[in-house]
């Protein structure tokens, strides 16, 4: 089984850069030049800052691939405002100190017109000031996250706790039980998400048996597993991330948690992360996201997006919601709509248009920014892992409000 938690630079290059015409401009830096050599005006510069190496490189590589696919589609359709788009990509390397230096390259050296990227909340917090405050550049953050990010000129296009918990947790109580454990990675997203999740659990008659935080590189969870089993926990609401999540789920399975009727839940789990464990080890795991691949069977536009991505990027780095690929798609298309409305690419003009931008079609359905909130309404889906795939078991009634800012 391919280990998604390890991705070498050589593997990345073979998957993305050399295969796609990208030109290396330094260590961890690539550019895909504007395709029109005789363009009358200078290209619009799109910056992508994401994890191309490190523990969550499977997600960052997919996000970079989505950006490449969409920028090519935009250029093939004539660009924006009659100008071609040029794509600049920086590796944030799952390392905040490295990321800050590389993001500065996008701002100071490449002078991009916008930056999209960051996966973990700690990464967003590290790079937002170099982009927005010091760099005076528009920033789009595409990943599901813990909420409360209300920085001007920073727009969030992934799901928030309200979108992921308000309907999902009552479903878990009905289809799992009332006794919850909250095992968590020790960084900002789990801490803040758990505050919200606990309120929803308790307001719906559930109980949080325990809430624990672990180092991001921890792989031995024997004491946690024992605590879950001995306390007869019904639902494990997990926010442990790679590399620890695979060993944790395996240890839970081996202790009989699933066999005894326990329910796994993880709101970032998508098709990429399904493959971290053997299917039997996470059978019945429930997730709540803005898109699952199984939607392609019922939605022609989802099928079109998925087919285009898989044609351009066959292999191990999947188009999936928990990896921020859908938020990347949504963010770039909303930005495109804003640029068209603004008729220019300066930060203030685009931000004013992006504040109320809408797209009629996108992964999982339409989406629209909530005016004045810099967050996005979208459809949400609850799915359960069965035999190594997902099955939709619930869906929102229309677009769900992010309830932020």
What are the roles of these predicted feature ranges?
Residues 1-34:
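N-terminal secretory signal peptides
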Residues 29-50:
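C-terminal segment of N-terminal export signals and the immediately downstream linker at the start
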Residues 58-65, 78-148, 157, 215-221, ...:
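Beta-alpha junction/loop-to-helix N-cap segments that form part of ligand/metal-binding clefts
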Residues 311-326, 332-392:
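Segments of small-molecule ligand-sensing domains
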């Amino acid at each position: 089984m391919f280990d998604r938690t390890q991705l070498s630079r050589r593997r990345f290059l073979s998957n993305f850069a050399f295969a796609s015409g990208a030109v290396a401009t330094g260590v961890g830096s690539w550019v895909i030049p504007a395709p029109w050599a005789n363009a009358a005006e200078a290209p619009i510069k799109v910056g992508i800052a994401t994890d191309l190496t490190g523990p969550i490189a499977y997600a960052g590589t997919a996000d970079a691939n989505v950006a490449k696919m969409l920028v090519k589609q935009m250029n093939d359709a004539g660009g924006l405002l009659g100008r071609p788009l040029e794509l600049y990509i920086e590796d944030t390397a799952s390392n905040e100190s490295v990321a800050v230096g590389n993001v500065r390259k996008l701002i100071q050296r490449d002078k991009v017109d916008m930056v999209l990227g960051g996966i973990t909340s700690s990464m967003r917090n590290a790079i937002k000031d170099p982009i927005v405050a010091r760099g005076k550049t528009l920033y789009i953050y595409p990943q599901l996250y813990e909420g409360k990010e209300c920085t001007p000129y920073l727009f969030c296009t992934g799901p928030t706790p309200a979108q992921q918990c308000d309907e999902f947790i009552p479903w878990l109580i009905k289809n799992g039980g009332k006794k919850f454990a909250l095992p968590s990675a020790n960084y900002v997203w789990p801490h803040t998400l758990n505050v919200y999740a606990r309120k929803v659990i308790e307001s719906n008659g559930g109980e949080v048996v325990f809430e624990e935080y672990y180092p991001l590189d921890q792989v031995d969870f024997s004491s946690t597993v024992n605590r879950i089993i001995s306390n007869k926990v019904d639902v494990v609401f997990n926010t442990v991330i790679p590399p620890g999540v695979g060993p944790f789920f395996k240890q839970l399975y081996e202790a009989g948690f699933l066999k005894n009727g326990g329910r796994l839940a993880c709101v970032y789990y998508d098709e990429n992360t399904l493959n971290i464990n053997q299917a039997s080890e996470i059978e019945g795991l429930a997730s709540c996201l803005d898109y699952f691949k199984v939607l392609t069977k019922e939605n022609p536009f989802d099928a079109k997006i998925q087919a285009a991505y898989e044609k351009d990027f066959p292999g191990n780095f999947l188009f999936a919601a928990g990896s921020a690929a859908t938020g990347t798609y949504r963010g770039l298309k909303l930005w495109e709509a804003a640029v068209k409305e603004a008729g220019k690419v300066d930060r203030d003009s685009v931000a004013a248009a992006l504040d109320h931008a809408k797209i009629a079609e996108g992964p999982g359905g339409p989406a629209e920014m909530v005016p004045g909130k810099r967050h996005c309404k979208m459809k949400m889906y609850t799915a359960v892992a069965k035999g190594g795939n997902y099955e939709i078991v619930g869906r929102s009634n229309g677009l769900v409000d992010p309830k932020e800012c």
